[in-house]
Amino acid sequence: MADQLTEEQIAEFKEAFSLFDKDGDGTITTKELGTVMRSLGQNPTEAELQDMINEVDADGNGTIDFPEFLTMMARKMKDTDSEEEIREAFRVFDKDGNGYISAAELRHVMTNLGEKLTDEEVDEMIREADIDGDGQVNYEEFVQMMTAK
């Protein structure tokens, strides 16, 4: 299944994987998964984290390695993001709930994920998604960005 991913997608997933893999040992533990999910405003229980890991832990060693992570991402993409997942993601970014993602809100979430971005990089990300040019990202623009192939 992971063989249907483009090189660009694999590179993006590698970057995402390293955000989860806090200690850089090449595997994601339940603790690391929990840290990232909490930084995104989720509050999973230990059991939920274990279930999430077990779902993709092909070799049964209790952690997720990069090939397992790729399989999980490929699977998720095949079920292409349901509207509800996209709306949920939008809410994570839209901290003040005004229906727009500002540069400050984007920077806040990315920083929580451990991504240190310059102001230019954040502005560039907003510009790429900002179709109507108002300097922020509304829900429609967010959907376009998330579903762009």
Curated annotation (Swiss-Prot):
Positions carrying N6,N6,N6-trimethyllysine: 116
Subcellular location, record wording: Cytoplasm, Cytoskeleton, Spindle; Cytoplasm, Cytoskeleton, Spindle pole; Cytoplasm, Cytoskeleton, Microtubule organizing center, Centrosome; Cell projection, Cilium, Flagellum
Residue numbers of N-acetylalanine PTMs: 2
Positions that bind Ca(2+) 1: 21, 23, 25, 27, 32
Gene Ontology terms for molecular function: adenylate cyclase activator activity; calcium channel inhibitor activity; calcium channel regulator activity; calcium ion binding; calcium-dependent protein binding; protein kinase binding; protein phosphatase activator activity; protein serine/threonine kinase activator activity
Residues engaged in binding Ca(2+) 2: 57, 59, 61, 63, 68
Protein role: Calmodulin acts as part of a calcium signal transduction pathway by mediating the control of a large number of enzymes, ion channels, aquaporins and other proteins through calcium-binding. Calcium-binding is required for the activation of calmodulin. Among the enzymes to be stimulated by the calmodulin-calcium complex are a number of protein kinases, such as myosin light-chain kinases and calmodulin-dependent protein kinase type II (CaMK2), and phosphatases. (Microbial infection) Required for Legionella pneumophila SidJ glutamylase activity.
Miscellaneous section: This protein has four functional calcium-binding sites.
Protein name: Calmodulin-1
